[in-house]
């Protein structure tokens, strides 16, 4: 489970992670809070939860021994450097190299020569409509063979690459999404049957409030409703009110 730091501190993280310790479908905790902000608290948290805690690699985590393992990714040189340091402290890690089947083949080759790349890799290749390969990677019981052909050992699907060619001047799907207006309504249980409600116009705004501790996260019953742009006067008025308040 990746919390992206939203548990904020050791005390909050301890309460949530001890509950998740009982869930058999949870194996590892990533970034419950950003450990460099409280390395002593991170060490205490490690002692009080059963399952391993990992964080994106930083040398200070090695010096302070405040995580059980790491997330490592990036270019070849930095990945090898970080993995060597992690191995010297006997810290396992996963490779996080997100991309298509090509990236997955690369990750398999790289990870095969890194002694402590022992945790399940994250490449997200199954999220894409096409792997850009003529043959999909085969994963069996969580393992895949390192491709043995020339180069990365896989054959590129040239037709797929051509079909996904884009005009660099055209806006990306993310840009088109961000151009539209929406209201993000977050609700969670209040007193009795009442609900507490916060509304925002952008993900960045509600993330800022969560990180500041102004609104509580990870409560049972919390819900996010996305209200897409409407032509109604009520939507335009409410969106303008929220935007004027920086929400």
Language-model segments: residues:
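Flexible C-terminal active-site loop/helix
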Residues: 15, 99-247
């Amino acid at each position: 489970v990746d919390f992206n730091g939203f548990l904020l501190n050791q005390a909050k993280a301890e309460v949530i992670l001890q509950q998740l310790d009982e869930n058999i479908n949870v194996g590892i905790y990533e970034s419950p809070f950003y450990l460099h902000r409280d390395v002593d608290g991170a060490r205490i948290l490690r002692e009080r939860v059963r399952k391993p805690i990992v964080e994106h690699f930083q040398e200070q985590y090695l010096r302070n021994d405040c995580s059980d393992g790491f997330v490592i990714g990036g270019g070849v040189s930095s990945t090898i450097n970080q993995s060597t340091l992690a191995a010297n402290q006997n810290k396992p890690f996963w490779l996080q190299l997100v991309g298509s089947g090509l990236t997955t083949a690369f990750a398999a080759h790289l990870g095969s020569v890194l002694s402590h790349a022992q945790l399940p890799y994250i490449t997200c290749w199954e999220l894409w409509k096409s792997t850009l390969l003529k043959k999909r990677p085969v994963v069996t019981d969580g393992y895949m063979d390192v491709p043995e052909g020339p180069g990365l050992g896989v054959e590129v699907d040239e037709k797929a690459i051509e079909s996904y060619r884009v005009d660099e001047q055209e806006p990306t799907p993310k840009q088109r999404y961000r151009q539209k207006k929406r209201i993000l309504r977050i609700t969670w249980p209040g007193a009795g049957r009442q609900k507490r409600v916060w509304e925002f116009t952008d993900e960045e705004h509600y993330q800022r409030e969560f990180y500041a501790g102004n609104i509580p996260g990870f409560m049972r019953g919390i819900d996010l409703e996305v209200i897409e742009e409407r032509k109604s006067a009520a939507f335009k008025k409410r969106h303008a009110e929220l935007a004027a308040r920086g929400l």
